[in-house]
Amino acid sequence: VLCCEGNGGYPEIGTPWVPLERGYSVLGWNHPGFGESTGLPFPEKEQNAVEACFLFAVHRLHFQPSQIFVLGWSIGGYTASWIAMNYPDIAGLSKKLSVFSNYFKNEVLDATFDNIDELSRRVAPSIFDPVLESVVKMYLDLNNLSHVINYDGPVLIIRRSDDEVISTGDDHSRATNRGNHLLIGLLKHRYVKAYNSCSIK
C-alpha cells in the first residue's frame, strides 16, 4: 500500500498504520518540504514524489502494479488519484482508509474533494476571488475529479459528517461537503444515460 498523507499528516504517525495493522506491506512518503523531505509541495513536485515512490515499489521492491493499492487521505487524494490516472493497472486507490480493509478491492475516496477552487474561496474575502482563481489555476490546480474520471477502476466514496476542512459552509454540513461534487462528477461521467434520464442532486 502506497500511502499519501493529508496536509497535517506524516507517514510515521498517519495513514500507514491502518494497512500495516492489517498485514499489508506499506510504503509512506513525505510531501516535498515536509518532515525531512526537501523541496516545495507544488502539484508537479507532489506528482514527481509519489511517482518516484511508486516506481521504487515496482522496480526495486519488485511489486507488480496490480499488487499495489494507493491510499490517500484528504489532500493526499490528489497524488493518490494522479497515480491511479497514470497507472490504471494498480490494484486500487483509497483516499483515507478508516477501518475497512475489505474495501481494498475498490478505489476508496474518503475525506477528499473534487477540486480546490471553492475551498480556496473560504479563506479570503470575496473581493479576492479573481486573484485566488488565477493563483489556484496557475500554481495549485488540485483537481481530483479530473483524475478520478480518468480511472476506470471501482470506486467507493466515503464522506465524513461534520468535516470542517472540505466543507464550504460555516456549519460544516454534509450538504456543503466537496466530496458530494466529487461523487456527482463521477456519476455524470460513468453513467451518462442514467444521469440524463433522472435528476442527481
Where would I find each of the regions flagged by the language model?
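Conserved catalytic-core motifs of eukaryotic protein kinase domains, centered on the activation segment
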Residues: T38-P41, T168
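Short, surface-exposed "cap/lid" segments of acyl-processing enzymes
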Residues: V1-G23, N30, F34-E36
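The feature captures the conserved acid-bearing segment of alpha/beta-hydrolase catalytic domains
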Residues: D117-N196
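Alpha/beta-hydrolase active-site loop
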Residues: L40-H62
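Catalytic active-site module of serine/aspartate enzymes centered on a nucleophile-bearing elbow/loop
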Residues: K201
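Primarily recognizes the serine-hydrolase "nucleophile elbow" in alpha/beta-hydrolase
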Residues: Q67-V123
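Active-site loop/turn elements of alpha/beta-hydrolase fold enzymes
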Residues: H31, L109-T112, R160
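Short hydrophobic segments within beta-strands
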Residues: C3-C4, L71, I158
